[in-house]
Every structure is written in structure tokens, then in C-alpha cells.
Amino acid sequence: MFKRGIATFTLDYGKCPKWLFERMVKLGREMSRVIIAEYGPDEFVKRIADPVWFQALGTVLAFDWNASGLTTILTAALKEAIRGEERDLGIYICGGKGKTSLKTPEQISLFGARAELSQEKINSLEYNSRMAAKVDSSLVQDGFQIYHHCFFFSQNGVWAVVQQGMNEKNVTARRYHWFSDDAKNMVIEPHAGIISDGQHTGLNMTARESENTQKISTELVQGSYNTLMKDLKLLSKYPINRKSNFQKGIWTSSSTPQSQVVSIKNKKQELTLLNLTDLNFKTHPVLLEDFTKSKYLQKILYEVNEIKPKNYEQLLSLKGVGPKTIRALALTAEVIYGAKASYEDPARYSFAHGGKDFIPYPVDRPTYNQTIATMRQLASKMKIGYSEKNKVTDRLII
């Protein structure tokens, strides 16, 4: 079952024209009504969590395919489209771009009360929203900074997240989709339908290959704080060699095409080092950091150590735990204790629709065709003018 997906595309800085946004709101209202009437509110939320479906919906509402603005404008248009009709339609949309994303918990609480959900369910929705944002900003450190977070949920408590990060260096944006169904483990491969137009190296703590690193990271904060601080100092004492210039006394214990795990031994201590090629850390700064210089990190680690989280998800959920904390623990687990993390991009395949820049890339053609065919059928049922309806269906080209 689809749980989470990622889409990567060009980063736009322009503003959506007022006339286009108003048009998208109008069409979005009609399309939302048709989808919910045809499939129900739970299915509407599920389809929002599908990157291909979401992209197709943006096309129906007359927005460019391959542009970051589709995410922010489409979610804003849908939110405006159902305003005042949430209870009747059975769906609720919270959050948005920038500062609006910070209002997500407040809006979940407000709409949850209107939907007459239990306080326990509302708290669960707020937790899922917060954790989805934390996972994609702290566990998937792919060079994209989250700046947009939108949370969808139904009258029955089914939820989806559509959030977006930007990479200004590469002038690209990446969209992350989450769906509640079967997302039982939020920190181990919570993604299935992943779409991207390129690979980006970085720390991927959601990969199953990072499961042992997660385990050791948790054990580090469950143990002695002083021992953890000594481990961090040990990292700065022995800089990691990326060019394979091993000194006397270093021996290779295992290797892969990308990396070599080595150990240094002396009378008092043993240190496991990782020799990594530039491929692994082309854009990832983790090896260049001296974690002993951050008083804030030491403070967070002390507070986490006092709590002693039971598992990695609880560790991530704690206040103050962010990308730097995750990196520090991951590198300690990897270098000193030999628990190698994954540095592979979670994106696995991509789809092509030309967009405004007409750049082709691989496509999941069967899924795309099925989505467009369904969208055409739904568009034919929209209560809009004949001319407008023709324009909508003309944009859906198989």
C-alpha cells in the first residue's frame, strides 16, 4: 500500500497571478466535490498522498507540471476551495507555506473539534503531522530545507501530508507525500511511491540499511552521558580520511565500492573509522563537523539522556532533537561502533510530463496513464461550462 512519495522538480520564485489562483479555486472546488461524491472523503485524502495523482490534479487546475509552485499554490487553492464546506465534504486541510505551516497544530485542533473527533485522535493527528515534518527534515538529510507543510485529514481520521523543501544551490524543490494507511513505522522506510528527477546524496536514516545505526544511536543516549561526550571528542581527535591515505597501524576490515571501514588500535582504545569517497558526501557536510564545539548540541544530548527514550522514534520526537543531533549520533554510531548508515537518496524512480521546460526523464507510464484516464472521467462530471470542461480535458493528454 502506498505510504509516502517524493517528487523533485525545478524551483520557482515567481508569484501566481490572481486570476489563475481564482480559477484554480473554482475548478478545485468542483473537482473536490466530484471526487468525494464518487469515492468518499477517505479516498480523496489517499489520492492527495499519491505524487502522480497530485501532479495530475495540478494540471487539471491549469498549473505547470514541472514547477515547485504547483505544490504551494495547489494546496492553497484546495484549502480555499473547501473553506466553509469542510464538514459537509468530510475533509479538512491545515497548514501551508512558510509561517502558515506553523499554524498546522492549531488548525488540526480546531478542525478536529468541528469534526467531533476524540481528543486522543486529535492528539494523534498533531503528532503525525509533527513527525512527518521531523522525518523529512532530520532523518532524510538530502539537502532540501522544508518550507511548506500541509496536512489533510478526513472525518474518519484518515490523514495525508504534502510538504516541500527547497535546495537553492541546485535550484530545485522536492515534494514529500505521506499517507496514514499502513504507516506503522515512521522511521524505517515509510516511503513507497517515490518520484524524482535526479539523485541527491546525503544521510538517509529512514533506510533499512540504517536500522542498526538507529539502534546504536538510541543506545548511546540511553547510556552514560559522559561516555557519549568522550565518543564525540574521539571523533574530533581522529579526523576521517576520505582519500585512503591510511597511516601505519590502520587495517581494512570490510569494504564496498563506496566506502571502507577501518580500525585504529593502540594500548588504550580502538577506533573504527570510515573511509568514504566523495560520491557519498558530495553535498553532505557531516564529516566536516566538530560536534564538540556546539554547546547547544551538548545541552540537547544531556536532556535526551535524562529522558532515555525507549526507541528511535521517541528519540526523534523529543523537543530540540533535529538534524545536527541525528548527524552527531549517526556518525558516532558509524565511526566508533561500526554501524554504517545509508547515504542513498530515498528517491527511486521518476515520471516525465515535459512541464514548462520540456526536459524529459524516466516515466512510470502505466500509473500515469491510469491516473489521467480516471481524471478525465472525473472532469467530465464537473459542473462547469462546456468550453471550460473541454479545456480541462484537453490538458489531460495520454
Give the location of each predicted region.
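Short acidic (Asp/Glu) and glycine-rich catalytic loops that position anionic groups and cofactors
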Residues: 32-37, 308-309, 349-355
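Active-site-proximal structural scaffolding
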Residues: 50, 144, 293-297, 308, ...
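Short coil/turn segments at secondary-structure boundaries
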Residues: 69-74, 344-346, 387-392
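Extended, structured, electrostatic nucleic-acid-contact surfaces
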Residues: 299-319, 335
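Phosphate-backbone recognition surface of nucleic-acid-processing proteins
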Residues: 327-383
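Intrinsically disordered, low-complexity, charge-dense segments enriched in Lys/Arg
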Residues: 375-398
